[in-house]
Regions:
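Sec-dependent N-terminal signal peptides of Gram-positive bacterial secreted proteins and lipoproteins
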Residues: 2-23
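A surface/secretory-pathway sequence property marking extracellular, secreted
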Residues: 87-111
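Short, solvent-exposed S/T- and G/P-enriched segments that are highly enriched in secreted/extracellular
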Residues: 109-119
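N-terminal small/polar-rich segments of proteins
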Residues: 22-96, 117-160
Length: 160
């Protein structure tokens, strides 16, 4: 019985011994080659710049720079909302009067949900879009005051 217990303890100790792996040593007595793993980690990064204010009747540049992302991906900037009722492009004054405005990306009208800028690092690591925030028609203005509102942009990584 003692021999069985001793054998079991020796076996358990042998299984618990760890082996250290060293780099390959090549000496004059040995020949061959050795391999070494090389690792370099690049974290994803990009910068999106959206102005914090624009005056109707002027433009604003939205830009993406320093794009380093996963292969097969692209940075997408979308206009995804407004402070207007039902996401309408409207601004209000303190008394609640509303004025409608439009947004254009070049000659194209921008609607809520539209992509305004895409940067794919396969072709460029920077990009910009000039959005024109067109003032309301002068004939539609009835009340004075300072009108304000917001637009919301969403930045996504999508498959290229």
């Amino acid at each position: 019985m003692k021999k069985i217990i001793t054998l079991a303890l020796v076996s358990a100790m042998a299984l618990s011994v760890s082996a250290t792996v060293f780099a390959t040593d090549i000496t004059p007595e040995t020949s061959g080659s050795g391999k070494m793993n090389i690792i370099y980690n690049v974290d994803p990064t990009y910068t999106v710049t959206i102005p914090d204010m624009v005056t109707l009747g002027t433009s604003a540049d939205v830009s993406v720079s320093n794009v380093v992302i996963a292969k097969g991906s692209k940075v997408v900037v979308k206009l995804t909302g407004t402070s207007g009722t039902n996401n309408a492009f409207t601004v209000k004054n303190t008394e609640g009067a509303e004025l409608a405005y439009t947004v254009k990306n070049g000659t194209k009208n921008v609607n809520v949900g539209d992509t305004v800028l895409t940067v794919n690092p396969e072709s460029a690591t920077t990009g910009s879009a000039t959005l024109n925030f067109n003032a309301p028609d002068a004939n539609s203005i009835k009340y004075s005051g300072t009108y304000s509102g917001t637009v919301t942009f969403t930045v996504l990584l999508e498959n290229a």
